[in-house]
């Protein structure tokens, strides 16, 4: 096994059975996604990170305590890796546990992250001449995202019953994708909203959704507050 340092992020590593030469494109994808997160959703605290490829029922997942992210993919599947890594890195950059009644919102936002960052990644790679293979591959990140979003189940976000259903089971993936599909245009037009996401875990657990949005708006950077109000109107 190899512990491969990401070239642009010295504190981040890929634990892989492949050497750096064979994992080059994979490393570039991880590196670029972290750089995009640094731009839009900066970490509240700089932490090391080890990414491992783990085929198991619990993967993909992140472990904040041990600074690890597991991806359930193979080194050649860079679109799948980008999709999973963006989702898990979104979780990883929320430093505190999110209240159980808001975990569905966290899951839906992290699903949104997959699609937002894959599309930004496609643009970055399409203009980079030093990674020819990934430059040619770049449009596939967008098509992968589009295909995933099609696999969703419609959710009425103004229905208290449907919100309650997601509160009780926040891993309803088809519903998460539906919510993500409705959040994505807002994040694309108001990317400053990503700066508020790390503060989701600061919202106390005893509040309902309207009050939680109010608290989230107060504790987030001032530049995000209008965008949070716009998100609340979706629900």
Task: Please identify what each model-predicted range represents.
Residues 85-97, 109, 113:
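Active-site His/Glu-centered metal-binding helix of metallohydrolases
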Residues 43-53, 97-103, 121-131, 195-199:
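Surface-exposed patches in mature extracellular/periplasmic domains of secreted proteins
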Residues 5-76:
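Auxiliary, metal-adjacent structural segments of Zn-dependent hydrolase domains
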Residues 26-29, 82, 106, 175:
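Hydrophobic (often cysteine-bearing) scaffold residues that line and stabilize catalytic clefts
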Residues 1, 151-235:
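Pan-zinc metallopeptidase signature
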Residues 68-85, 96-105:
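Short pre-active-site segment immediately N-terminal to the catalytic Zn-binding motif
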Residues 16-26, 96-101, 169-170:
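Second-shell loop/turn segments in exported
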Residues 104-149:
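Post-HExxH zinc-binding segment in Zn-dependent metallohydrolases
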């Amino acid at each position: 096994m190899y512990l491969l340092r990401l070239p642009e992020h010295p504190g981040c590593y890929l634990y892989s059975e492949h050497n750096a030469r064979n994992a080059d494109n994979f490393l570039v994808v991880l590196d670029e996604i972290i750089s995009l997160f640094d731009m839009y959703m900066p970490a509240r605290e700089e932490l090391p990170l080890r990414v491992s490829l783990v085929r198991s029922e619990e993967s993909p997942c992140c472990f904040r305590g041990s600074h690890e992210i597991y991806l359930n993919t193979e080194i050649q599947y860079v679109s799948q890796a980008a999709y999973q890594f963006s989702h898990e890195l979104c979780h990883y950059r929320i430093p505190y546990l999110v209240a159980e009644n808001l975990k569905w919102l966290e899951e839906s936002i992290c699903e949104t992250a997959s699609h937002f960052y894959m599309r930004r990644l496609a643009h970055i790679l399409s203009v980079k001449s030093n990674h020819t293979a990934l430059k040619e591959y770049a449009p596939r990140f967008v098509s992968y995202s589009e295909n995933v979003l099609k696999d969703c189940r419609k959710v009425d976000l103004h229905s208290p019953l449907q919100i309650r259903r997601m509160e009780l089971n926040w891993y309803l993936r088809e519903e998460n994708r539906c919510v993500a599909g409705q959040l994505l245009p807002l994040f694309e037009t108001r990317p400053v909203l990503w700066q508020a996401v790390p503060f989701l875990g600061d919202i106390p657990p005893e509040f309902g959704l309207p009050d939680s949005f109010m608290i989230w708006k107060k504790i987030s950077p001032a530049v995000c507050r209008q965008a949070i109000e716009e998100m609340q109107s979706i629900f």
